[in-house]
């Protein structure tokens, strides 16, 4: 997962300090379809191997990621937090500028997940993802990659999201 964070940082360096989009609607369908690019497609040139998107602690359950959205990569892999890359933003790059991340050391970008390419925070009633989205395949916890590049294991109940602090969102500094 650390390599994914490094790849996202390298991508941002090449694209004016902007994080990769969750998804780029190449066919104009308005929905994720075969041939569209996802965040994994965007950073693939920086990791050189699609196997990096597979958590080594979980066996592959679907076809390997080939850079197209219709595969959804590995269902036992990693997902990106959509707070930092709105799905409805204009096409490339459309992600959040790094300068907009007020507290990078406590802002989650990628995590262990088994439900597809990304986690849709908009579907949560509070407007942010809750800890139920994380897959706890590592000793009842989950690995989280933060915007500053570090990766840390936490029990899913340790990830805070309240009115004053939310590791899933771009919070105010200070």
Kindly label every feature range from the protein language model.
Residues 1-174:
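Short, well-structured segments within or immediately adjacent to enzyme catalytic domains
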